[in-house]
Amino acid sequence: MINNIFIKIFLVFLVCMSAIYFGYQYYQNSKPVITIYPDELPTKIKPSIIENNQIAAVHSTIYENLIAKDTNIKTVKLLPDPEKPMSIDSRNQSQSDESFDEISNLIALIEPNNNAKNETDLNIIKLEKGSKDKVSNAKNCKNNESYKVQLGSVKSEAEAMKEGERIKKQFPKILKNVVITTKKVKYDDGKFFYLILAGDYGSLSQAKAVCKKLAYNKQSCVLK
């Protein structure tokens, strides 16, 4: 008897739940389907005049020009691909150092030959005694002329020598058998600083070749 009551209650509950479920599905299916259409409004809506006040730039057409238009593919210009970054290889750098060494060696060989050729092509002119002394002094000054390269500047002489030796060890091939010296220079306010100099070099071309090799290796260099 009790079992029959429970079965009847369960059946009634099941019928009610089924009715609610199917009623909800029917309600959902009876709703209209929402369809989204393209917006036909202009890109820019021009505001109206408020209290006889004209809004600035109300007639600007910049937004209208942004509207996508049909583009002819034949009129499109394609930009070239960007350049690829340079790849720096240590092997290429060593080869460049060797080429610099060869260039400096060639310059050192060509320079004396040119000087000797120029001396032989000079016309012989007889000079007075006083003129001979002036020419002799000028020639001695020219022979004693030398060039140095500036590697940097610091505040003390000891620091200058230390930094110069460090740079010399860093570039043993370029600064081989070079004497590091310092030069005291005065500021406008009375203070002093010291230049780090390497040399002497017998010709300007030789000093320039050394500076080019140092600059290639990212070391500051100035001819003095």
From Swiss-Prot:
Q: Which GO terms describe its cellular component?
A: membrane
Annotated InterPro entries: SPOR-like_dom (IPR007730), SPOR-like_sf (IPR036680)
* Superkingdom of origin: Bacteria
Q: Which GO terms describe its molecular function?
A: peptidoglycan binding
Q: Where in the cell is it found?
A: Membrane
| Pfam families to which the protein is assigned, alphabetical | SPOR
Q: What UniProt keywords are attached to this protein's entry?
A: Membrane, Transmembrane, Transmembrane helix
Record's SUPFAM superfamilies?
Answer: Sporulation related repeat
- Annotated SPOR domain ranges read 141-224
Membrane-related topology note: Single-pass membrane protein
Q: Which residues cross the membrane?
A: 5-27
Q: What is this protein called?
A: Uncharacterized protein RC0096
